[in-house]
Amino acid sequence: MRINRLKLTDFKAIQSADINFEGKSTIIFGINGTGKSTILRSVNLLYANIINQIVNRKELKQYYAIQLEDIRYGAKETQIRAEFDINGEDIEYGRRMVRSTGKKYENKDGIKRISDIFHEEYISDEIQGDIPIFANYGTNRLVLDIPLRIRTHHTFDIYSSLEKAIENKIDFRTFFEWYRNQEDYENEKKIELENLNYKDKSLEAVRAVSYTHLRAHETDQY
């Protein structure tokens, strides 16, 4: 799942933009005020609705809406459109807002098709594999809290990776809770299988990333 093309019309300071994304990654650079954050915000606005359509759970809802200040000064409305490639199928989805009425519109057929493919390919009764995820790391993304004690508990499932995907303010609360739960599960499996070398695949993936960024190894002694 990826964006192939992004079209902006009268969005913030951008009168018109047509951006084609090529390759596996894209770098957007420029001096202050050229619209880098504007482009990222437009992508967030599209994915917020897509995530809400796919998940449809209150606790994972992304509160990210087009505002009147997103409409370029002097323009009657603003529009954001993107062409998505999902497993080889091209789908267009867009959102717009009219200044005079404040009404917001979206391409319901496009977002429904994206959601349908997502569920068919990744979350059907027969398939429970890895899913495409979206994460926004804005310039002002903050870690507000690193809790040492977990007072509330969550039920983790395949949708949990999309929690707070758009928000700029985050904490590690649910991550630590998930990690502890997985460690308990891993230890239980060691006893059940009578194999002290058993490793949970999810934990191993997180450990590998952590050790890589710390420039450390699991066998290092301190």
Predicted features by range, described:
Residues 213-222:
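Single conserved hydrophobic/aromatic residue that forms the stacking wall/gate
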